[in-house]
From Swiss-Prot:
This is Tryptophan 2,3-dioxygenase. Its EC number is 1.13.11.11. It catalyses: L-tryptophan + O2 = N-formyl-L-kynurenine. Heme-dependent dioxygenase that catalyzes the oxidative cleavage of the L-tryptophan (L-Trp) pyrrole ring and converts L-tryptophan to N-formyl-L-kynurenine. Catalyzes the oxidative cleavage of the indole moiety. Heme binds at H240. Its cofactor is heme. Binds 1 heme group per subunit. Homotetramer. It holds the Pfam family Trp_dioxygenase. It comes from Xanthomonas axonopodis pv. citri (strain 306). Keywords: Dioxygenase, Heme, Iron, Metal-binding, Oxidoreductase, Tryptophan catabolism.
Amino acid sequence: MPVDKNLRDLEPGIHTDLEGRLTYGGYLRLDQLLSAQQPLSEPAHHDEMLFIIQHQTSELWLKLLAHELRAAIVHLQRDEVWQCRKVLARSKQVLRQLTEQWSVLETLTPSEYMGFRDVLGPSSGFQSLQYRYIEFLLGNKNPQMLQVFAYDPQGQARLREALEAPSLYEEFLRYLARFGHAIPQQYQARDWTAAHVADDSLRPVFERIYENTDRYWREYALCEDLVDVETQFQLWRFRHMRTVMRVIGFKRGTGGSSGVGFLQQALALTFFPELFDVRTSVGVETRSSQGNAGTAGS
């Protein structure tokens, strides 16, 4: 159908009798969603709307990310490798979206932000329940974080549930054990509330996988999927820190933290340390023995 006079006619099949029927806005509950942006500044500061929407949309993406990571854990428990890889691929794209979103907030100048910062009171992104929940799902577990949510018993209970359950990485290690890899017994049952720290006893397992990718392709592919997720998560953390630095400099955070300094510390946290450490040792012994053999025969 050609377009005439820069107008597009409605096609005959398009529904226009929508009284009492499910509509786009009704399905998405847009009346509730789009009425949730309520600036507190008086008169309303123009840029507070940007600040609110930035964080609300981030929380929506975090909700999806948590949904996908929980699914990945279930798939691993069921030994469903390809289904797990699918949701991890989606998780990576969600993190990319979250990372790129900071470019919108970066258009906020320091003076614009200071124009409404006081109305935020002690509220802070540090108090994002979903962010902490995702950290726990990925293995960055810190029981101290429960204190922040004492005001929200239901949310605190949800966070505690994730704290006390195996993380995504721990379920991956249990998956490897079921398929004959020499995972130490402690990873079958331990205090799941403790954060995972780098463990040299796991390195031979991953060296074997990374040095024999044809034989262990499924395991290798899952390792790389996890590396992708952590890399993208760290890029998001880094972009967050740089955006805060750009907008407020080195002022203290609204929630009482040191601000940029506190965010910088998060960049040193890791989810899957052995998957990065193994790259240092892969092939080293092989190359060393080959080099020694060559010297002896010369």
